[in-house]
């Protein structure tokens, strides 16, 4: 029997929709995984590592080459310095890093702020840690979304100890502006809050956005000592199944994350760690090409959905577009997404899956993933024509 605090999270809609798509042959634009491989050089390093016997437990913090490559990437791209020995920890994906950060650094009973809508692992992780989730909704901003910094300030109470900040943001595609990040930093310092940043889409900020470049919160004054920066290879190098992530932060923060992580999975992905180290050191050009390709795919899907009558919100980063099907006569996105695979042969995710159970504010929006081959996207667009 599942314990009460996890009963609301027993089954994820992503697993349900992916299974349904596979069962009936629907094009899966629901779950955010690509259907093309990462850079060939990286794959070759992994293959060689397996052949050469790199198949046993790696060091607990991750192999030195990967920790060094992570630190070098953060310095090269963001001018943020980390000691690879004491300030970098390799994890089994970013999801484990988030879980270990909350479990290892936030006392039970504490409030953790999250921006709504939010990635689906945040709530169960907060529940597993015995903490209390407190949501701060994003607000409409023209064709996109923005942070209501006054609402964030108002949400901080005497029991608030941490916040999870995700930018580029899944599921909306929003990228927090410099001004929004600065306001978050000022609040965190003033209220003495721990900040866990989920930056897995850091490489996928599109060139036509107002911001153009991902900016880590750890760069802001007073934030280095209170920020756990989390990212992964999954979205950067098209290897979601490798589950190689990392956490970076001050030594005392990483010690807490490691204390929890070592009893969750201990280690993982031995032959993939040298491959990701290689990619971080050598595949910046490949990542830029990936970003440009995804920007084109975003534009193709956005134009098609708009032509069909959806109201499509701007996506400044990530794999995702948010669309409003109300102009087509659908006012409940949960019902729309339940019917769509059967009616059109396409799977998508209702925005309600990323929200508090009692909040219907977002239930008019649908998330579509565009991280697919061009022929897959074209087939999805062709099938969606039935909605006209």
How should each PLM-predicted stretch be described?
Residues 110, 131, 190-193, 223-225:
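A short helix->loop->beta-strand "cap" motif at the edges of active sites that frequently abuts
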Residues 138-211:
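Active-site phosphate-binding strand-loop segment of PLP-dependent enzymes
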Residues 2-93, 100, 151, 279-282:
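N-terminal small-domain helix-loop-helix segment of the aminotransferase-like
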Residues 102-126:
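Conserved PLP-anchoring active-site segment centered on the Schiff-base-forming lysine
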Residues 277, 294-302, 312-325:
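Conserved glycine-rich beta-strand-loop-beta hairpin in the small C-terminal domain of fold type I
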Residues 24, 129, 190-191, 308, ...:
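Helix C-cap/helix->beta junction micro-motif
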Residues 153-154, 339-348, 354-388:
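PLP-dependent enzyme catalytic core of the Aspartate aminotransferase-like
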Residues 224-295, 302, 308, 388:
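Conserved core segment of the aminotransferase class I/II
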């Amino acid at each position: 029997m599942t314990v009460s605090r996890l009963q609301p999270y027993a089954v994820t809609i992503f697993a349900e929709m992916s299974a349904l798509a596979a069962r009936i042959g629907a094009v899966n634009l629901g779950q955010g995984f690509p259907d093309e491989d990462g850079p060939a050089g990286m794959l070759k390093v992994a293959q060689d590592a397996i052949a050469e016997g790199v198949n046993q437990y790696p060091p607990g913090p991750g192999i030195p080459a990967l920790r060094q490559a992570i630190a070098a990437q953060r310095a090269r791209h963001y001018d943020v310095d980390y000691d690879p020995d004491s300030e970098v920890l390799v994890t089994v994906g970013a999801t484990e890093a988030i879980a270990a950060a909350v479990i290892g650094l936030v006392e039970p009973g504490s409030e953790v702020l999250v921006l709504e809508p939010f990635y689906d692992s945040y709530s169960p992780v907060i529940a597993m840690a015995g903490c209390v989730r407190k949501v701060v909704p994003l607000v409409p901003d023209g064709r996109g979304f923005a942070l209501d910094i006054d609402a964030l300030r108002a949400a901080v109470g005497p029991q608030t100890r941490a916040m999870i900040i995700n930018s580029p943001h899944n599921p909306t595609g929003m990228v927090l502006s410099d001004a929004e990040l600065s306001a978050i930093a000022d609040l965190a310092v003033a209220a003495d809050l721990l900040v866990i940043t989920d930056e897995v889409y850091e490489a996928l900020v599109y060139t036509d956005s107002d911001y153009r470049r991902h900016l880590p919160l750890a760069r802001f004054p007073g934030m280095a000592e209170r920020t756990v920066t989390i990212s992964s290879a999954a979205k950067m190098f098209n290897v979601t199944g490798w589950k190689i992530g990392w956490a970076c932060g001050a030594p005392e923060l990483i010690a807490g994350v490691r204390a929890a992580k070592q009893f969750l999975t201990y280690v993982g992905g031995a032959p993939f760690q040298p491959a990701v180290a290689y990619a971080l050191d050598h595949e910046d050009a490949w990542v830029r090409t990936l970003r440009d390709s995804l920007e084109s795919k975003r534009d193709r899907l956005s134009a098609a959905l708009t032509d069909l009558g959806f109201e499509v919100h701007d996506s400044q980063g990530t794999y995702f577009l948010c669309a409003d099907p109300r102009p087509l006569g659908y006012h409940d996105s949960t019902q729309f997404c339940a019917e769509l695979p059967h009616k059109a042969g396409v799977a998508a995710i209702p925005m309600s899956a990323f929200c508090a159970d009692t909040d219907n504010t977002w239930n008019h929006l649908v998330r579509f993933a565009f991280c697919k081959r061009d022929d897959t996207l074209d087939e999805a667009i062709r099938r969606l024509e039935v909605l006209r």
